Amino acid sequence: MATWSNLGLQDSASPLMEQLNFFHDHTLLILIMITILVGYLMLMLFFNKFTNRFLLHGQTIEIIWTILPAIVLMFIALPSLRILYLLDEINSPAITLKTIGHQWYWSYEYSDFMNLEFDSYMVPTNELETNGFRLLDVDNRIVLPMNTQIRILVTAADVIHSWTVPALGVKVDGTPGRLNQTNFLMNRPGLFFGQCSEICGANHSFMPIVLESSPTNYFIKWITAMNSN
């Protein structure tokens, strides 16, 4: 989900997404090198006018094209395994947010606070304000503190959904009867948008996610106001 004038990935808002960006660039560089090498060899063979009538086998080249791809795969697999481990590791979360997917809206529960839960629906186009984002704005945003370890629990009430915020590098499937979890830490304030990433019915495209990252003191004020209401 690109933003204005953005042809690549979104700017990262969490250390995990930053690691994913680095891994993307690392892997893309390897793929470009492979493409150039294979293209060069194909062109050389295509325009080569020499023939070897006595070639029976090429044991040396067979060993090379077996070992070389294995080494290249190691350079891709090891960073990938490291990031997969980091994505699953949860270190002493300060706040737990429970997310429930419905057809076609999200419900949120702040498990660490008393009676703090709400539903989040997409704002229809005819009710959207001038500075709103079409098909991305919601009536109730999630508000979470920045520079804080957050754990998110995701499930669903009807069919399979997927809670996804690209700027944070978070994508968790919500499956009825199961509770999936992941963690993230937002390192800058701002609004981060996401959408359901699992086809879940007719209005699958109309259940966006809006997460507001704010300093801790503003988050405490928001929590106090929500509890008083």
Curated annotation (Swiss-Prot):
Pfam families: COX2 (PF00116), COX2_TM (PF02790). Component of the cytochrome c oxidase (complex IV, CIV), a multisubunit enzyme composed of a catalytic core of 3 subunits and several supernumerary subunits. The complex exists as a monomer or a dimer and forms supercomplexes (SCs) in the inner mitochondrial membrane with ubiquinol-cytochrome c oxidoreductase (cytochrome b-c1 complex, complex III, CIII). One of its GO terms (cellular component) is mitochondrial inner membrane. It is found in: Mitochondrion inner membrane. It is a multi-pass membrane protein. It comes from Simulium vittatum (Striped black fly). Component of the cytochrome c oxidase, the last enzyme in the mitochondrial electron transport chain which drives oxidative phosphorylation. The respiratory chain contains 3 multisubunit complexes succinate dehydrogenase (complex II, CII), ubiquinol-cytochrome c oxidoreductase (cytochrome b-c1 complex, complex III, CIII) and cytochrome c oxidase (complex IV, CIV), that cooperate to transfer electrons derived from NADH and succinate to molecular oxygen, creating an electrochemical gradient over the inner membrane that drives transmembrane transport and the ATP synthase. SUPFAM superfamilies: Cupredoxins (SSF49503), Cytochrome c oxidase subunit II-like, transmembrane region (SSF81464). The gene is COII. Residues 1-26, 83-229 are mitochondrial intermembrane. Keywords: Copper, Electron transport, Magnesium, Membrane, Metal-binding, Mitochondrion, Mitochondrion inner membrane, Respiratory chain, Translocase, Transmembrane, Transmembrane helix, Transport. Binds a dinuclear copper A center per subunit. Its EC number is 7.1.1.9. Cu cation A1 binds at H161, C196, C200, M207. The chain crosses the membrane at residues 27-48, 63-82. This is Cytochrome c oxidase subunit 2. Cu cation A2 binds at C196, E198, C200, H204. It catalyses: 4 Fe(II)-[cytochrome c] + O2 + 8 H(+)(in) = 4 Fe(III)-[cytochrome c] + 2 H2O + 4 H(+)(out). Signal peptide: none annotated.
